[in-house]
Amino acid sequence: MPIKVQNRTLKPGQLNVTQKTYDNIVLQQLRELWTNYGTLDEIWFDGGYTTSLKDPITALLTELQPEAIAFNGYGVSLNSARWIGTEMGIAPDPNWSTGITNDGGDPNSSIFCPAECDTTLQNKDRWFWGVNATLRSLSELIQVYHETVGRNCLLMLDLTPDRTGLIPPAYARRYKELGDFIRSCYGTSVLPMENLISDDSLEYIQLFVSSPVTVDRSVIQEDQTYGQVIRSYIVDVKLVNTTNTHQWMIVAQGTSIGNKKIDLWQVGPLLINAVRLTITKTVDKPVIKSFTVHLCN
């Protein structure tokens, strides 16, 4: 993205352009990119923009791509997303949907600016294709998924073509392996949402089943249409054993939910006949978009 022109140490072949001329070139190039390639889902401001370009870029975005998410775009777009602060594929826990700092956000901020986690398929933080580049293992990518998407962070996993302009077959296979895992693990809940009871305030949701099932993780999604309002929660399950079929046990608890929170139960797979989500702290009436449990081998 645009930078400030520095003409004090020009090298042979460099033009001595003014900041005004440079800004004009940038704006013309942005108009071309934002006009000739259809509707854009996301625009990256990787490195920011100069003060002199802030207002012109804001106007251009509003005119040409008003619905696009603007990565690092706070100040020029209302649809901004913030950087999580690392390219390793891990978000802090908790990770809030509000705040503009490059970290886990701020639950007390009035600025809605969800985080994006960008990382590479190749090892050693390598973004561009290389002849001898190696790929991250499937197990590592699964961990990346849980520590980004599962922590309320949008995952942007690098997609790099080779010198033919195509995605190498080995790369495509690794992407598919990750997709297959996500679909097989999280595609269907062991306890469907139809088997649900809740109180009028929606501060707790309980899933139940007539025959015991084995599960090892839970997924919560908060409806953030009017903001992120949940501040803490507990997930507990009703165990099935030979001595007491009515024993409740806490398997997960946390603070931020946001778009998605995946809790891998440290106690491992459990045989249960009910699971309950209790919202223990909220700043407004909570709306749970989804609450599911799963068993993943």
What function would you assign to each model-found segment?
Residues 1-269, 278-296:
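Mature catalytic domains of secreted/periplasmic carbohydrate-active enzymes
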Residues 273-275:
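Exposed beta-strand face motif in extracellular beta-rich ectodomains
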